[in-house]
Amino acid sequence: MSASAIHIHGYAIISDDDRIADSNGRTPRSLRNEADWARFQHELDRADLVAIGRLGHQANPNAKHRRRLVLSRGAAGLEQRGEEWWWHPAKTPWREVTAMLLPDGGRVAVPGGQAVFDLFAEIGYEAFHLTRAHGVLLGAGRRLFTACERGASAESVLNGAGLRPAAPETIDAAANVTLTIWRR
């Protein structure tokens, strides 16, 4: 299969101020939602590879032993460490990563963090599953994309990446949580 057979899906739950983490770099309780978590876990189970930042990897042990690609400036390029693959994007191009890890194509799940979301926006998402916890404002912390730190909305970044939104779906009415899937 060609590189076009690689299907990249991003996943994030964000606050009304487009944040994915608090000022300590952690996902706050206000962004944890059982309906979103169940959907997210199902999507990770469908993936052939999960691309995650080093901090996310350290904070979320790979208990289900999913095939994981950890993005880190500390990697030599593309290397295997235990059951995970580690990748330094500046040292090894994405096409080499996919040739090695997904030679027959497949689905890549991207759960973040910010630098990882930014990188895959450049590589090209097929879809981005954007969950929003309405009524939640963090006020400080990490935003979804670097451009959001400069005032852009998450939606404008996704639109600029060539994605278009489907109709929002309420996944938890009591908590006022919606999911919008943006697709190419």
What are these regions (language model features)?
Residues 1-184:
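Enzymes that bind and transform nitrogen-containing heteroaromatic metabolites
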